[in-house]
Amino acid sequence: MEKIKLIKTLVFSIVVTIGTSLSAQDFKKLDKSPLDIAAYPSNYRESNKELKIIYSRPQLKGRTLSKLAPNGEIWRTGANEAPELTLYKDFYFNGINLKAGSYALLTIPGEKEWTIILHSELNAWGSYFYKKENDIARISVPVITTSDSLEAFSIAFEENDKNITMHMGWDTI
């Protein structure tokens, strides 16, 4: 009888303590540019991913793309920290053999083409401390415009002809 009373008292104390602790937490609000992940293969049933990118998704909110990602300037390719591209196997990128591992993704927007940069400096806030000597690889890609506007910056992967293409979209590009 005493054991049961002791156990009931203990359980009640734990429940009250946990309830009080949870209600006392001060959780941060959702970030204005929430994190997202794009992976290949994109099918959620496929657990053997070949690559993934973690990035933040800024939104236009009435602003222009050229104001948020100015032409000719290094851009963090999203918001907050520079995106982190993780390769789970070796890949060729513009003729360069990239070893499996993680790389920062930066870009230089342009009117007709963008330069995509894979960089060794991880965990970098924005592109403020960018050093060209830490570039691993660069490639220039043409700008393709569309009539539809995309409010939030987005990244997706697609396989074509046994290659994996990364698509980045924001506003009308």
List each model region and its residues.
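Primarily secretory-pathway and cell-envelope proteins
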Residues: 25-76, 127-173
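Short glycine-rich, polar/acidic loop-and-turn segments at beta strand-coil junctions
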Residues: 16, 57-59, 89-91
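Short loop/turn segments at connectors of secondary-structure elements within structured domains
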Residues: 18, 47, 99, 110-113, ...
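Bacterial Sec-dependent N-terminal signal peptides
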Residues: 1-27
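Generic structural signal for beta-strand residues in well-ordered domains
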Residues: 15-17, 96, 159
